[in-house]
Amino acid sequence: MPFISSAELSSRATPPDLQKRKYGEQSQPSEPKRQKIMGGFLDDDDDDDHDGLEAFNEAQYQSEFEIQEQRVDLPQISQSGSRAEPKRPKIMGGFLDNDDDDDDGLEAFNDAHLESQIDTQEQPVKLTEVSRSQSTLESVVINSVTERSTIVPAYAPPNISPTSVKIKTCNGKALNVPLKKPSARVSYERLIASRSTTAPGRAQKSYYGIDIHSLLNESAKEVKAAEAPKPAPVADVRPSIEAPIGDKRSKKLSTAMWTEKYRARKYTELIGDERTNRSILRWLRGWDPIVYPSLARAKQNKKYNNDEEERPHRKVLLLCGPPGLGKTTLAHVCARQAGYEVLEINASDERSRDVVKGRIRDALGTENVKGMNVELGEQKVRKVGRPVCVVVDEVDGVVSGSGGSGEGGFMKALTDLVLLDQRNSARTSERASDGRKRKGDNFRFLRPLILVCNDVYHASLRPLRQSSVAEIIHVRQAPLENVVSRMKSIFTLEGIPSDSDGVRRLCEASWGLAKRKQRGVRSTGAAEGDIRSVLVAAEWVAHKLRNESSAPLRLTRNWLEQRVLADAGGGSFFKGMNRGGVRDIVDRVFTEGAGFPDVPLGDESLQDPYDRSEAVSVDVANIKKRHAIRRLCEMVDASGDHDRCTSECFSSYPLQPYQDDTFLTKPNAAYDWLHFHDTISSRIYSAHDWELGAYLSQATSAFHLLFATAQGKAQQQYREIDEEEEEAHPFSGPRADYAAFEATKQNQAILSTFQSSFSAPLLRLFRSSNNVATELIPNVIRMLSPDIKPVVVRGSEQKSVASVRKESERALVQSAVRVMTGLGVTFEKVRIENEGGGHGGWAYRMEPPLDALVSFSKVPGFSSATNPVRYAVRQVLDQEYRKESIRKNSENLSSTGSKKSTTKSDDIETPANPAEAAKLKYGTAVKRDFFGRIIQDRVPSPQEDMEQALSRKAKSAQQELSSAGRKVWVTYHDGFSNAVRKPISMAELLSGL
């Protein structure tokens, strides 16, 4: 085979002059034998023509391909003269071409082809130095004809297929595009396997699947693993009785109950209502201008700043709701989220008024902070102090009265503290007439106060509920889905596998709810929303699940219903947690079935437990009644308030619809049961017959048996109509006597407060409160309701200003303002809220509320003593009253300063030098301008004279102190006190250094 090389020529190559001869020349006898060149390469094999033909084809194809890849400019070679040769047939691509038109160009083609091959061998180019971009391909200059298969050798030419296609561009440039090389044939199996998708981590499919040998190997391994001997089971490791070594906090949490262990400690861990959480945080952020004055965000300057839409911030927050909803936890988490440290006070344990006057007053009235000791390993580090937020828990459990030893009076002292802050906040610059400060006048709320209660309608909370000093937020119960997801995560942390249905059934049983299919429209749980009860029940179920078997069991719905709810012990445990308040119990008394789920029917439930004979059977209706009465008695006994439940049933049954005969049989039977309850209660508390305590709940059960009705759509519509009807009389219903007593007590308090602000002449005229109520107050209301038509004008900042234009109306306004000033009656701007918490507008409320004393019954035919007053009328009166108060304060200050300047001789300064004395004696010289006109000096006002005299006196006093050389020593002690203050300058502090 010939040696083929497309790179540089070796030193032993044939000289170029021997290769410039054309193919097909006949050799002469006198000349030496010429060497054969095929396709631009030397062929030394003369013996085997067939081998040379194959080598020629291969070398021709490879040289053509490599020259095209090098992409170098081929120089043109001039046509050299050649000897005339006889015409030979032309073969192109293995076919005979009889076209004689191109015979002239054939010889030029042969010469150019041979010379280009020689030049290519003389000027080798490395393949790595040639660029292969498309742009270089277009720049190649090809001056020779591309079809090189027209070489006519002396022997028959081989059949050579074309390797490129000639393309001519628009600008006349010719390009050669190589044909696509034949690729290896791909089998159908591999083509199908390449198109199929392979899952990650799975074996790659080839030839329609996995190799059968690998499958056999894997199956053999599985058989061997199954036949291998299993290891002996390891005994369960029992927990050690020794205390674990670690953090003290982790020890406490590991041994703590679930109610404390899984208490929410971050804002993101709260599962309650989001609206309630945001409302509490918004109220706490309202304290930022007071607690964090440097970090408080400045209000954005709006183009139209409507001051009326700004809601006044209230200093006290009251959280109310049923027990177990997480009110205390919510207050703690929100306070820490807002940057406070919580100071918790339990009002049930510390119910004395001294606690309010001591700890609570000091915490709220001072700008103190509270630090904490944080344990980092074995060391205790003092944490940076934070402002204090006071949380008073269970405020509805305090004693409303006041004992001799200070017991009770908690809410009264707290209410007085709130009202004192309200008075000090509303007070401007006026002081007492005698100039002395009263005790507690300067108290202000500087820290937030949060109150937590269960019943907002408790008697002890009436002052806070009726006044506008506290913002009341009703804590809503958490959604069942949130509680289920949280309990499922707790079971996962405890290592107990559970199903969602099982956890849901556990929550429903803890809340006293029925199943979804058995739950009706009016069926509610006795402890619905109580998260604490769910945690207690879940912990008890977890212990039971662990103790039943050593193998880990799964908490499912079937296991819970068969092993816990159907069991006597477990059923009584869940029923004992179904406690509710008095209002909930009374609502259940007058509901058929008491709102409980239906009892599961069985063989035992169809028999009377109090009858020994087997022949007596009980129907389904009596089974439901018996089940409801038993559960209702359990709720009454769990609440422990038997007397209140009975009295509430007595006051509520006249308003309930029930069916009875004309002889009033059911009310007579109810009175007999009330007599029975009074007899049992008196025997228990007087004769100490505690054995009769089990019969205290029977009267409540009797009311349920007599007056319970079905709760359907008709009764719901009936109740809606009753709520929409206007009340016939303010003191109507079963509790009319109590409502009248409370209203009388409230009116007496208003009268005493109004009468205490009277002057001596008014006290001589109106000595008793009855005279004030009948003679003075109706006329005062008419005086403060003048017949005027004010004009309301809004400024650029959308602040409304009301004014009157007529002189007669101005006179009426001035007389009304004089009445307000003499009696101490003011108007306070308050915000009206709708039931849903929306903004309902603004109104001016009279303080003290004298208009409430002259509004009588709403019965048709009776009207109020006065007509309703417009908002603009009271706005005009309030504006004029404020102007009058400012004017009087300025007059009092000026009169006080003038009296001091005239009575004290120290205020008059004598001239120090004789020149000033001469001026005072002979008068001052007249000042004239350039033209000789007299310049009039401005005469200072008396107020300016007083200010100049005071400034001169202060300067003289400072000179005396500096001349005397008085020294002041300043020492620092832990804390601070505002009892004694003295202004000291830096010169006095640095004078002794």
UniProtKB/Swiss-Prot annotation:
Entry annotated with the keyword Oxidoreductase: no
UniProt-annotated stretches for the region Disordered: 1-52, 65-107, 887-915
Key words, A-Z: ATP-binding, Cell cycle, DNA replication, DNA-binding, Nucleotide-binding, Nucleus
SMART domains: AAA
Comp. bias intervals (Acidic residues): 42-51, 97-106
Binding residue positions for ATP: G321, P322, P323, G324, L325, G326, K327, T328
InterPro entries linked: AAA+_ATPase (IPR003593), ATPase_AAA_core (IPR003959), P-loop_NTPase (IPR027417)
Location in the cell: Nucleus
GO biological process, one term: DNA replication
SUPFAM superfamilies xrefs: P-loop containing nucleoside triphosphate hydrolases
Pfam families listed in its UniProt record: AAA
Molecular-function GO terms, alphabetical: ATP binding; ATP hydrolysis activity; DNA binding
GO cellular component, as recorded: nucleus
Role according to the record: Essential for the fidelity of chromosome transmission. Required for the DNA replication block checkpoint. Replication factor C (RFC) complex has an essential but redundant activity in sister chromatid cohesion establishment.
PANTHER family in the record: CHROMOSOME TRANSMISSION FIDELITY FACTOR 18 (PTHR23389), CHROMOSOME TRANSMISSION FIDELITY PROTEIN 18 HOMOLOG (PTHR23389:SF3)
Protein family according to the UniProt entry: Belongs to the activator 1 small subunits family. CTF18 subfamily.
Record-given protein name: Chromosome transmission fidelity protein 18
Species of provenance: Emericella nidulans (strain FGSC A4 / ATCC 38163 / CBS 112.46 / NRRL 194 / M139) (Aspergillus nidulans)
Name of the gene: ctf18
